[in-house]
C-alpha cells in the first residue's frame, strides 16, 4: 500500500477538481493508487473524466529550436527550483542555447545533451554549472523530444510551461502552429479514435457500467447508453474529432 501523502492528495485534486477530503478518502480506499482512486470516483459519479498525468510540477521552461529548412524541431525542458528563476533572462538564454545545440547534435537524452558543445566551446554541463553558481539554484536539463516532418512542422509553447511539436503531411507552418496550439490547450490523447488501445476502451466501459444512472436498467438500454458514451469519450480524446480551439 502506497502512503497517502499531501502531494498525492494535491495531484488528485488537480486532476479531478474535487475537494481535499473527498480526494483523501478516495486515496485511502484505493490504498494510495491514484489511477484506481480516479476510476472509483468516476464509477460513483463523483468525478468526470480526470486530467491525464504526465505534466511535471517542477518549475522551469520549455525551449524550442527549429532547423533552417523548417523540417525538424526539438523541444527541451529545463527545470529550476523557483518560478522567479524560470523567468530570469540568464536562465531563458541558457535554455535556448541548449535547444539549439541539442538540435544540431540530434541528442534527446539528458545525459547525452550534457556533453554537447555550445557555440562558445563550453559543454552544456559546464554552462549549467556556471549558471548554478551565478543564480544560486539547482538547474537541470530534464528531457527533450525531437520531431521531423515530411511537409510542415508546427511548434507552440504556452507560457514557457507547455510545449507541443506537430508534424504534418501537407499544410504549412501556420497550420502546424494552429494545430500545436490546439493540442496545448485541449491535450488530446490520440490523433484518431482508432488509435485508442482496446484496454483503455474496456476500462472506460467498466467505469460507465458502474455509474449510478446505469443501475436497474435493462441490458439493452445499458448497452445503448454505453455506446453513446463511448462515442462521446472517443471524440473528447481524439484530435481529429475535437472542436478546433480557435473556432
Swiss-Prot record:
- Its principal location? cytoplasm
Q: Which InterPro entries match?
A: EF-Ts_dimer_sf, Transl_elong_EFTs/EF1B, Transl_elong_EFTs/EF1B_dimer, Transl_elong_Ts_CS, UBA-like_sf
Query: Gene Ontology terms, cellular component aspect?
Result: cytoplasm
> Could you tell me where this protein is found in the cell?
Cytoplasm
| CDD domains cross-referenced by the UniProt entry | UBA_EF-Ts
On whether Cytoplasm is a keyword of this UniProt record, the answer is: yes
Example GO molecular function: translation elongation factor activity
Q: Which UniProt key words apply to this protein?
A: Cytoplasm, Elongation factor, Protein biosynthesis
Q: Where is this region: Involved in Mg(2+) ion dislocation from EF-Tu?
A: 82-85
NCBIfam families tied to this protein = tsf
Q: Which family does it belong to?
A: Belongs to the EF-Ts family.
The molecule here is called Elongation factor Ts
Q: What species was this sequence derived from?
A: Arthrospira platensis
- The gene it comes from is tsf
